[in-house]
Amino acid sequence: MAAWGRRRLGPGSGGGGARERVSLSATDCYIVHEIYNGENAQDQFEYELEQALEAQYKYIVIEPTRIGDETARWITVGNCLHKTTVLAGTACLFTPLALPLDYSHYISLPAGVLSLACCTLYGISWQFDPCCKYQVEYDAYRLSRLPLHTLTSSTPVVLVRKDDLHRKRLHNTIALAALVYCVKKIYELCAV
């Protein structure tokens, strides 16, 4: 019981409080190095990133600043669309429970349309992009486990592969429920 709350240290750590550096296999981490070889270096970086995404490495470290920033922004926009779909769809579905029925459709219908629009845009632009399986890693402990000491860049972008099956199911289920609600509500408003 006294060991609760303590981190177990690996062999050879001596119990001195230092965390063990976990070695990763070659299939776990890929580094897109910032090495300029001629005029087509940027294209080479993009090609390496595409190959790493398609190979489904657990971690991808992107040294080139421009490509790293573009990739991080692309992932952020996809996350924003996903969250907007879920939150707007939830607002669409729960607004009729919180507001009087005479006024709830003024909020629920626009929220439902927003949810459907974001879901459609996500489905067209992000759903089949291999980049949507990755998230930008910010956790200092997880970053300390990666071989970042070999990099030449001081601000690399680190991507970690995450299973997004449940996230997509939630996303699509809420958007579909919002669609059903909107169609039903529009039918009721037009029939009156």
Curated annotation (Swiss-Prot):
Subcellular location: Mitochondrion inner membrane
Family statement drawn from the similarity comment of this UniProt entry: Belongs to the TMEM11 family.
Keywords: Membrane, Mitochondrion, Mitochondrion inner membrane, Transmembrane, Transmembrane helix
Function statement: Plays a role in mitochondrial morphogenesis.
Location of the region described as Disordered in the Swiss-Prot/TrEMBL record: 1-20
Any single Gene Ontology cellular-component annotation: mitochondrial inner membrane
Segments crossing the lipid bilayer: 84-100, 107-124
Predominant subcellular localization, coarse grouping: mitochondrion
Presence of keyword Coiled coil: no
InterPro entries: TMEM11
Subunit structure: Associates with the mitochondrial contact site and cristae organizing system (MICOS) complex, composed of at least MICOS10/MIC10, CHCHD3/MIC19, CHCHD6/MIC25, APOOL/MIC27, IMMT/MIC60, APOO/MIC23/MIC26 and QIL1/MIC13. This complex was also known under the names MINOS or MitOS complex. The MICOS complex associates with mitochondrial outer membrane proteins SAMM50, MTX1, MTX2 and DNAJC11, mitochondrial inner membrane protein TMEM11 and with HSPA9. Interacts with IMMT/MIC60.
Protein name: Transmembrane protein 11, mitochondrial
Topology with respect to the bilayer: Multi-pass membrane protein
Organism: Bos taurus (Bovine)
BP terms from Gene Ontology: inner mitochondrial membrane organization; mitochondrion organization
Gene that this polypeptide is encoded by: TMEM11
